């Protein structure tokens, strides 16, 4: 966000309705010359979170690609967007929230698909011994969160629902790893966090769930792409192939989660049983979906909510950042089939 390592005062640039009269959101796929489909010399630089895409693609048997993949581990959406903006990544992923700040900064990034993910692992936790039973009890308390991420958004909405705002709490912006350490030391009374760190806080330290992100988040997690890569015909073809493989991998994981959990555990060191517990309590199955009007409207609604909550100081129009040139990846023959 400034990405979240910088102060809000540096996020003042508004996204103008014109990210350009001609945007990638309205262009079709680049056209390959006849016979120019050899991808053997293409390298896709893909951002992965620990235990996610890299582990998923390998475990599902989708790793034999006609192009080379160079995995780069970056563990929040802000870092993915910063790397794409700096032309250090071709693909990444994250939530709709980093994407809002990218829009406001006119970052060189596009959103080309959405992953549907579990929202019950997006949690607002209280320490087991803290006098906190509901969100309203957070007033005056030390509450950790990760700026410009889903935790920033759903915590803002939960506070507003309880008649509070960030001004009513002692909000502490921490990375997930630093937040877990702070929770362990007793430096936080509550923590808004996502993923396996929330599970670790519950299992290791007896943290209690006050609320989840279900009902506050859309469940859409965009796939981020480098517009320079989208414009290159060979890279566009490789990205389209990767999206097909990724969708098959997610569908495979829905029916083979134990195998996926083992692959995740190898990277994260989170016990397989803990990952299975998260899965068993999921709000939805995995899926990868094409961009449609509902996706764009949902993202704009998040932007408008952030503006109303005072997190953004001006309107952001997100539609110009959504690219629909990969729609054929979701209609390709056999795309919905899981690998054997």
Predicted features, each with a name:
Residues 34-165, 170-173, 189-195, 210, ...:
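Short, glycine-/small- and polar/acidic-enriched structural segments
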Residues 97, 178-267:
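Pocket-lining segment of extracytoplasmic ligand-binding domains
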Residues 82, 86, 136, 153-157, ...:
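Solvent-exposed, polar/charged alpha-helical surfaces in well-ordered, non-transmembrane soluble domains
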Residues 233-313:
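Secondary-structure end/capping motifs
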Residues 73, 77, 117, 148, ...:
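Solvent-exposed, acidic/flexible segments
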Residues 304-340:
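Conserved C-terminal helix/tail region of periplasmic/extracytoplasmic solute-binding proteins
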């Amino acid at each position: 966000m400034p990405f979240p390592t910088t102060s809000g005062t540096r996020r003042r640039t508004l996204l103008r309705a014109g990210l350009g009269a001609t945007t990638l959101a309205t262009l079709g796929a680049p056209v390959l010359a006849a016979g120019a489909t050899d991808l053997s010399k293409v390298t896709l630089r893909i951002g992965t979170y620990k235990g996610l895409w890299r582990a998923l693609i390998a475990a599902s048997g989708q790793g034999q690609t006609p192009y080379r993949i160079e995995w780069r581990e970056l563990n929040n959406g802000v870092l993915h967007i910063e790397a794409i903006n700096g032309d250090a990544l071709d693909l990444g992923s994250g939530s709709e929230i980093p994407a809002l700040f990218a829009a406001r900064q006119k970052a060189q990034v596009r959103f080309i698909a959405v992953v549907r993910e579990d929202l019950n692992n997006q949690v607002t936790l209280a320490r087991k011994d803290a006098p906190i039973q509901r969100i309203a009890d957070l007033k005056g308390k030390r509450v950790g969160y990760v700026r410009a991420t889903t935790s920033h958004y759903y915590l803002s909405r939960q506070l507003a629902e309880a008649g509070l705002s960030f001004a009513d709490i002692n909000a502490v912006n921490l990375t997930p790893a630093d937040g877990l350490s702070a929770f362990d030391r007793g430096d936080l009374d509550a923590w808004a966090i996502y993923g396996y760190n929330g599970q670790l806080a519950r299992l290791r330290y007896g943290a209690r769930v006050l609320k989840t992100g279900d009902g506050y988040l859309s469940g859409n997690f965009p796939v981020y792409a480098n517009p320079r890569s989208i414009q290159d015909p060979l890279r566009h073809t490789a990205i389209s192939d990767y999206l097909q493989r990724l969708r098959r991998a997610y569908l495979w994981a829905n029916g083979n989660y134990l195998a996926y959990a083992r692959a995740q555990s190898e990277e994260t060191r989170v016990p397989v049983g803990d990952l299975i517990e998260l899965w068993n309590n999921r709000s939805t199955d995995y899926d990868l979906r094409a961009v449609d009007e509902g996706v764009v409207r949902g993202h704009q609604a998040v932007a408008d909510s952030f503006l109303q909550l005072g997190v953004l100081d001006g309107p952001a129009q997100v539609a110009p950042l959504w690219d629909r040139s990969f729609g054929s990846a979701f209609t390709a023959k056999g795309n919905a089939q899981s690998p054997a």
